[in-house]
Design a protein with these regions (language model features):
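Glycine-rich beta-alpha junction loops
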Residues: 1, 67-68, 111
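Catalytic core of the metallo-beta-lactamase
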Residues: 1-29
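Amphipathic, non-membrane alpha-helical segments in soluble helical-bundle scaffolds
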Residues: 19, 43, 73-76, 80, ...
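Surface-exposed cleft-lining segments at the edges of enzyme active sites
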Residues: 31-40
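Conserved phosphate-coordination/catalytic loops
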Residues: 40-44, 135
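Divalent-metal (often Zn2+) His-rich catalytic cores of metallo-beta-lactamase-fold enzymes
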Residues: 45-100
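C-terminal regulatory/interaction regions
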Residues: 92-152
Length: 152
């Protein structure tokens, strides 16, 4: 997620206190949202961290936002897929000349549709937005894309 974040495994229970690397998920929901605020999102490192979590096979995940989840592989798979999908989505719109506000509006439409498809209601989409709003998430992804392009 970011170079300064850590995760802690409790060996007796197998619980991984994963922080933001495990995404945003509200209790009672299956939907996992990647928290991508600026300034230090690193998608490549994040995916490596997700794969590292898979290798240590925790029994449960405790993301910063919120709760405890036992469906570790499903959770991580959805997070990784959505992270890569959102990165491509934002990058394509940047290439088309869209600015951060336009991209954030489009990402909100996309993200809300994804949540509703997984059974959330409009009130729950608002709760997810409180945990990580699209304007902030979009700016984080855009900064990552710009930084990656400068070093390519």
């Amino acid at each position: 997620h970011a170079y300064h974040h850590l995760a802690y495994l409790e060996p007796d229970s197998g619980a991984l206190f994963a922080g933001d690397v495990a995404g945003i998920r509200l209790p009672g929901q299956s939907y996992v949202r990647p928290p991508t605020p600026p300034p230090e999102i690193d998608v490549d490192a994040w995916i490596k961290s997700i794969n590292h979590i898979r290798r240590i096979t925790p029994a449960s995940l405790y993301p910063t936002h919120f709760g405890c989840y036992d469906d570790v592989e499903r959770h991580l798979g959805e997070l990784e897929q959505r992270l890569q999908d959102w990165l491509l989505f934002v990058e394509e719109r940047m290439d088309g000349g869209a600015g951060s506000e336009e991209i954030a509006d489009e990402l909100k439409d996309k993200g809300d549709a994804e949540m509703l498809a997984e059974g959330a209601d409009t009130e729950e989409t608002r709760h997810y937005d409180l945990a990580g709003n699209y304007e902030m998430l979009t700016i984080g992804i855009m900064r990552y894309v710009e930084r990656r392009r400068k070093t390519a």
